[in-house]
């Protein structure tokens, strides 16, 4: 396999940090090209970026350190460091390997709390997708996972679908029918999450598998994006921009990738929190979203119905 990849962590300036990666991986069902753009910015209000990310195969992950808590930035950095140490660039882990790495990341964040004398709990969200093998390497899957209210979406060129379920107080109210999704966006408890890496001795992540097939695209983000832009806004930007690959890398004053464009739009909308975005595009055998949009949408919907985590 070949790759060109870079790890991104935090950035403490408004312009943020931009990363572009491309990886070519040989899988049982063909040659896969993985293209990711990632961007992070501190936002327009805060002074420290507590988000961290990695965008290199096999990991495409965002961690959002718990704002207002001790060591929020160190918590998110610890998660990314542990995951990349245990699931190194170029590897294709098993689902058990990924789960073990998430457990180790939780232990690493718990250690931060212990080092601080347990005055305050360190914690972070975690969301992402990993390229994982099963059946002794005979099959390959996307292993999706999340803890907290950072999100992962699928994008087929027209339809943006949230795959993860927020672990938050307002999501529980929505699930109970007490409030609408629109009301949840402005609810006074919208920043309260019900799960976090490092919050408890055992981490409870939602995890499920999707097939790696044809042309696929994922959006992975911290809530700094989704609290400034609704899903329609995000879908509009994805459709207008067209993909992860920079459209005009020589235009220094303009966003050069869809991830950069999304971060810039969230900043313009208020930028009240740190903002981190990864857009991952996967293609096997040269497939494109235009070629397989309808087929992929139907297949993904059916597979998600069978595999989505349930309470």
Question: What is the predicted function of each stretch?
Answer:
Residues 1-311:
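PP2C/PPM-type serine/threonine phosphatase catalytic domain
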């Amino acid at each position: 396999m070949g790759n060109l990849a870079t790890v991104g962590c935090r950035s403490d300036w408004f312009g943020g940090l931009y990363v572009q990666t491309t990886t070519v991986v040989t899988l049982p069902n063909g040659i896969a090209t993985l293209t990711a753009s990632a961007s992070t910015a501190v936002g327009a209000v805060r002074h420290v970026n507590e988000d961290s990310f990695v965008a290199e195969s096999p990991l495409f992950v965002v961690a959002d350190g718990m704002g207002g808590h001790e060591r929020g930035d160190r918590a998110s950095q610890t998660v990314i460091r542990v995951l990349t140490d245990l699931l190194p660039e170029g590897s294709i882990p098993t689902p058990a390997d990924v789960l073990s790495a998430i457990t180790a990341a939780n232990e690493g964040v718990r250690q931060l709390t212990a080092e601080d004398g347990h005055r305050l709990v360190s914690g972070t969200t975690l969301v992402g997708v990993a390229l994982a093998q099963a059946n002794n390497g005979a099959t390959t899957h996307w292993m999706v996972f999340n803890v907290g209210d950072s999100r992962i979406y699928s994008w087929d060129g027209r339809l943006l679908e949230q795959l993860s379920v927020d672990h938050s107080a307002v999501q529980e109210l929505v699930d109970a029918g007490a409030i609408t999704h629109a009301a949840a966006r402005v609810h006074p408890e919208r920043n309260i999450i019900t799960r976090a890496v490092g919050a408890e001795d055992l981490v409870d992540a939602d995890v499920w598998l999707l097939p790696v097939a044809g042309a696929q695209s994922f959006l992975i983000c911290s809530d700094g994006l989704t609290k400034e832009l609704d899903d329609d806004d995000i879908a509009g930007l994805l459709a207008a921009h067209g993909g992860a690959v920079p459209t005009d890398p020589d235009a220094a004053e303009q966003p050069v990738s869809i991830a950069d464009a999304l971060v810039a739009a969230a900043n313009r909308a208020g930028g009240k929190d740190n903002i981190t975005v990864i857009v991952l595009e996967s293609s096997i055998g040269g497939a494109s979203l235009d070629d397989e949009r309808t087929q992929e949408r139907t297949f993904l919907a059916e597979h998600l119905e069978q595999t989505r985590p349930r309470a």
